[in-house]
């Protein structure tokens, strides 16, 4: 069984680095920065394929004090429904590209503040909703795999 390593530095030619991004597509920290520097991620593109990577939005910037003359912004997790829809689109994309192998990082579990359980269960919900054969070209982090396997969604 293959798992996505915590510090993925190199990909095979058919490999795609799957990372969590913010809704502005500013890839300035965590796995997003790795995707930008090593795997062709594009600043300004919040979701989807880019270079040898694929972005899934997990966080956004929100106004903290909108009533002030000079509002400040802070980061927040995207709503779960937004993450779920992005996971749906990702799974559909993987099913349309069987020639590629997708290495999913622990998206959203760093800067964005999601727990492993929350993200893995969001993927589980997305996987369970598909009426097509589940793609076998996704490599999961061990922690995600254990939850998906427990729920009977991966072998």
Predicted features, each with a name:
Residues 1-155:
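Macrodomain-like recognition of ADP-ribose-binding/processing modules
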């Amino acid at each position: 069984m293959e798992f996505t390593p915590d510090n993925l530095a190199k990909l095979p030619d058919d490999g795609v680095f799957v990372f969590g991004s913010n809704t502005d597509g500013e890839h300035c920290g965590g796995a997003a920065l790795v995707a930008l520097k090593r795997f062709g991620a594009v600043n300004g593109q919040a979701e989807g394929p880019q270079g040898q990577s694929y972005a899934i939005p997990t966080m956004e910037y929100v106004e903290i004090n909108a009533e002030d003359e000079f509002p400040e912004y802070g980061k927040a997790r995207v709503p779960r429904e937004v993450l779920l829809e992005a996971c749906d689109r990702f799974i559909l994309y993987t099913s349309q590209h069987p020639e590629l192998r997708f290495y999913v990082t622990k998206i959203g579990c760093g800067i964005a503040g999601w727990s492993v359980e929350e993200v893995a269960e969001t993927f589980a919900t997305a996987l369970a909703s598909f009426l097509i054969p589940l793609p076998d070209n996704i490599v999961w982090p061990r922690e995600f795999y254990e939850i998906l396997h427990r729920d009977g969604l991966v072998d």
